[in-house]
Amino acid sequence: MAQCVQSVQELIPDSFVPCVAALCSDEAERLTRLNHLSFAELLKPFSRLTSEVHMRDPNNQLHVIKNLKIAVSNIVTQPPQPGAIRKLLNDVVSGSQPAEGLVANVITAGDYDLNISATTPWFESYRETFLQSMPALDHEFLNHYLACMLVASSSEAEPVEQFSKLSQEQHRIQHNSDYSYPKWFIPNTLKYYVLLHDVSAGDEQRAESIYEEMKQKYGTQGCYLLKINSRTSNRASDEQIPDPWSQYLQKNSIQNQESYEDGPCTITSNKNSDNNLLSLDGLDNEVKDGLPNNFRAHPLQLEQSSDPSNSIDGPDHLRSASSLHETKKGNTGIIHGACLTLTDHDRIRQFIQEFTFRGLLPHIEKTIRQLNDQLISRKGLSRSLFSATKKWFSGSKVPEKSINDLKNTSGLLYPPEAPELQIRKMADLCFLVQHYDLAYSCYHTAKKDFLNDQAMLYAAGALEMAAVSAFLQPGAPRPYPAHYMDTAIQTYRDICKNMVLAERCVLLSAELLKSQSKYSEAAALLIRLTSEDSDLRSALLLEQAAHCFINMKSPMVRKYAFHMILAGHRFSKAGQKKHALRCYCQAMQVYKGKGWSLAEDHINFTIGRQSYTLRQLDNAVSAFRHILINESKQSAAQQGAFLREYLYVYKNVSQLSPDGPLPQLPLPYINSSATRVFFGHDRRPADGEKQAATHVSLDQEYDSESSQQWRELEEQVVSVVNKGVIPSNFHPTQYCLNSYSDNSRFPLAVVEEPITVEVAFRNPLKVLLLLTDLSLLWKFHPKDFSGKDNEEVKQLVTSEPEMIGAEVISEFLINGEESKVARLKLFPHHIGELHILGVVYNLGTIQGSMTVDGIGALPGCHTGKYSLSMSVRGKQDLEIQGPRLNNTKEEKTSVKYGPDRRLDPIITEEMPLLEVFFIHFPTGLLCGEIRKAYVEFVNVSKCPLTGLKVVSKRPEFFTFGGNTAVLTPLSPSASENCSAYKTVVTDATSVCTALISSASSVDFGIGTGSQPEVIPVPLPDTVLLPGASVQLPMWLRGPDEEGVHEINFLFYYESVKKQPKIRHRILRHTAIICTSRSLNVRATVCRSNSLENEEGRGGNMLVFVDVENTNTSEAGVKEFHIVQVSSSSKHWKLQKSVNLSENKDTKLASREKGKFCFKAIRCEKEEAATQSSEKYTFADIIFGNEQIISSASPCADFFYRSLSSELKKPQAHLPVHTEKQSTEDAVRLIQKCSEVDLNIVILWKAYVVEDSKQLILEGQHHVILRTIGKEAFSYPQKQEPPEMELLKFFRPENITVSSRPSVEQLSSLIKTSLHYPESFNHPFHQKSLCLVPVTLLLSNCSKADVDVIVDLRHKTTSPEALEIHGSFTWLGQTQYKLQLKSQEIHSLQLKACFVHTGVYNLGTPRVFAKLSDQVTVFETSQQNSMPALIIISNV
């Protein structure tokens, strides 16, 4: 239980006090009424004695009584009515609420930190009122009157005669059978005569004389002169006198209420009295007080009788709070004791002491002795009951019967003179004067007698008081008999059916157990008495049980919370809304955030309803909000009910302040960080073959890799525009801002271009949500040229659209548990600073065609496609938290976030706006296929644009054509076949012979120092006017790798008028191309060994080309035709085809392979002289009657783009560790000997069957030959991963390695050729030695002087190697030393000697070479490319 202000040792004596009646004359009552008090009320604050009093027990032992309190009340002849008592208790509890600002106790139990009120004053008020309102009962005497004060005034004509009348009236009330109420302790009641004297108006001398007369008649100890009203009421305001009565009078004022629904019920017999008590649910305030001389009307008597039922929980409790409020209001301003001074207070206090010392206590002491003597004489004992107690209770105990074995004898009545009642009467009298030892003895004796007689009501009363007396005995001679209390409670409840007495028993026992820290037993006891017959009592007991659980040594937090919920429920049923709300709030501390979602929902729902009933609308909204924003596990129907309650409450709140700011709505959830902002118009849909550029849209998902590619492309084109330098203030253009983009700067938007904000909603409920009139909330700072700034806040989006137009979504439906985005647009019409604050909308739910609660059309209800049950207008803010800062040490050690300004765009001046459309743009190509499409550029703004460029990472994929495109007319055949190439018709004589042309790479945008990725778009006059459009051809070439390719185009353009904020704009397009296999081309180049017919020193080479058809016919390709092979080089050109016969067909079916061999020669000196102008010589070898001009668009375009992309690939460079620069130069000279700059272009046609039609596709492949003898491919080769190496844990020594050319490079330094007859006939029988002349030609392939050593000696691998059969020897000089100039050819005449016939290899001479100005480290043997075989025959 909660802590109490009083201890149990103080509580029980104050709850059971001697009762004294007061009977006043009318004049005496008038004197006290001058102070707005009755006589009994006048005495109430002074009814406790301030000093100890003494009395002697029957054994003449002195007994000390501490803090004795007496209860004086007017005589009332009607018992209190159950309905009135119930009403009074309700009002007492309602009127006692937690004090505002009271600091609660913080209890820590496990993971819980609970703020719990340490005290429960409402329960203490209820308990006090309940105990003091107990009526006088026949089976006990605790509330029976012990004495009666007869009060008259000194101003009366005959005061003594008035006393006689009052005495007779008291005697008539006590002894007349017409009055069964009130109850009197003994027939000979003490009468105490009090003479009231008004000091301010009365005659003091007369009062003294009357008092002297009284003393002679009634004795000095039986009367008293009480002087009051020392000042007049008109002087009451002159000085402030304390008002000790106000705390006692609130309950009395409650008693004066009317309009109860229970009728009067006058008790006419003792039996009826008992039966009537059975229906009492709880009793309140002091029933002894009432109106003067109204003997038939109890203060709790009901005045109206409309419903005779005594229902415990009738509707009357609903008026408790209001009636209490009215009562308080009526009493406000009344000053009690206005005519009394502090001296009068002391006189009243002295009067109570005199009455107690001289009248009441001697009377009680005398009565105890008389009762003791009566009991002794009746039982025939020789000594007093007190002295015989030990003997009586020590032996031969009567076995107590079980409660279940006893008959229901609660109606058994004893006559007033019965000895059993005399024992009980003596026990009660001893208890009232705190003589607990004697009281316990008497109760114990009476209990035995009652049980023997099976008078269960009497027995239960004796057991109850025996247990209390045993506990209160000084020194605690015996333990507290809790089983007495348990038996008494069970008897009251189950046998006697008297819940009032059972409740009193529980209240006392719980306090006794709590004082012994037996909280578990106390909680069980409190819970046991909860029942359906009284919600108020059950609520209070459950709450105290909850406090027991939390105050245990190991607090039981969840039990505390559960019982607080039960208590709150019963408080709610009892009409105690404030207490119900408090209980639920206390319990919420335990359930909140622990995953008990259903319990949380129930508590919040109840808190919301109770708060709404109490008009705490903000609290109600908050509670309902919590139900909706938490992840609920409720059913859809329940969630719908919650939502409707919330909307109803919310609507009431909003109606209180219709002109106030829009409130925040809890639903639906908004994921602010997922908010995306898009600047610009929506993308146009495809129109037939006309497809708009993909650009940027909110439908695209963010890809960091793609975003980085676009950034690099933009940087690349900006660098080209700014002559290779990226401006310091450059920032990549961002059309779509999201959580991944850089939002640290204010984004730039263009006036008259829409701003789309995508808001991510999520409905956590299982019911539909309908948002109506959904739009953005914004704030705008217009900026004009005068420099004035104006701020306008638009909360209604339709108010002034001339600044910012806003789109309104009339209906936006979100299904249960659905995530859905809404795209809302703003249309800026003025330059300035825009701040997007949030969204505003009406929140409702669909009710179908039904109206809710019969309300019909409410304000805010929407009549549209859906039928709303109810809707409320509100907003939600879009607050986006920026990224976590982690740069400086301070930022790393603290939690700081940067700004996120995606919702704060700056509206800039008008800019051009480009739209790009692609016409006949393919989605599928063969690898290397050439296709012609068209691109349309449209300026849809009011500003001209210029500087249009396109940049792509894949420039080899497309071309707009070079400068030569207009110089080459279309041939008739090309037009007829719709060929993408420029062609001319040739005659048959040119077959297999190269046709020469030339072109400059500058004409195709591949000039020196330029970036091939950035391509200017050839606009007419370089400007596109507003509203103008232009169509340009675009050739496409399928990538060499099969698969799906994503190719990015970035179009860059500027405004003719330079803007300070935005310098350029971009447009993005991503093309998706699916390529399938076509041809694989391999090529190698090697030196020709033939030195004949060579002009000059250029030399010639052979080019071997292998073409394989790798298409698997999935694209419907029947066959490929090789229509032309072209070369492009600054130094070399194809001369003729070597192996093609006239009837050789060049078509390749699936998986077929074709081989070609071509002779390549050096370009003429005139042709090669233009190398500095980036001129390339193109040689075309055609296999048909139509020449494709390879030096024109689009063939040359794609060749140059493939060349530039190849040049971008990292080349293998020699490590530079040599000591001298001359050594490096030598190495470079040697490397150049094996290098070749020859590019092969294979042009083909493919015949495709599609939809029963035959189509002709065209394409080209490129092979770039760089090194003699090294195979090159038209398709990229897979790189093998390097082998794993062991990890080294030491630093390698820095050893300088001399740079040496490779063996292959050295072998290409000198080209050798042997000239000899293939067969030679010699008559060996005539001459044994055969001499054959051989010419050795040496050709210097480098451009430096070379020293050559020719060694003719046979190389032997071991000393044992001898001349074997088939060998020959060289005659003459065995070693030659020569020096060859740059590209010089030298011949040596040699003689070979044979002694046998056979086939011999003449390729045995070894040639060593080194550069003339270098050391011998470069010497190496020159290896012949093929054996030189000679046949020696005998004739």
Swiss-Prot record:
Residues 302-312 have a biased composition (Polar residues). Coiled coil: none annotated. Keywords: ER-Golgi transport, Golgi apparatus, Phosphoprotein, Transport. It holds the Pfam family Ig_TPPC8_4th. GO terms for biological process: collagen biosynthetic process; COPII vesicle coating; endoplasmic reticulum to Golgi vesicle-mediated transport; Golgi organization; vesicle tethering. Disulfide bonds: none annotated. Its main location: Golgi. InterPro entries: TPR-like_helical_dom_sf, TRAPP_III_complex_Trs85. Residues 301-321 are annotated as: Disordered. The modification Phosphoserine is found at S273, S279, S309. The keyword Phosphoprotein applies. It is found in: Golgi apparatus, cis-Golgi network. GO terms for cellular component: cytoplasm; cytosol; TRAPP complex; TRAPPIII protein complex. Belongs to the TRS85 family. Plays a role in endoplasmic reticulum to Golgi apparatus trafficking at a very early stage. Maintains together with TBC1D14 the cycling pool of ATG9 required for initiation of autophagy. Involved in collagen secretion. Component of the multisubunit TRAPP (transport protein particle) complex, which includes TRAPPC2, TRAPPC2L, TRAPPC3, TRAPPC3L, TRAPPC4, TRAPPC5, TRAPPC8, TRAPPC9, TRAPPC10, TRAPPC11 and TRAPPC12. Interacts with TBC1D14. Interacts (via C-terminus) with TMEM131 (via C-terminus); the interaction is direct and is involved in collagen secretion. This is Trafficking protein particle complex subunit 8. It comes from Homo sapiens. The gene is TRAPPC8.
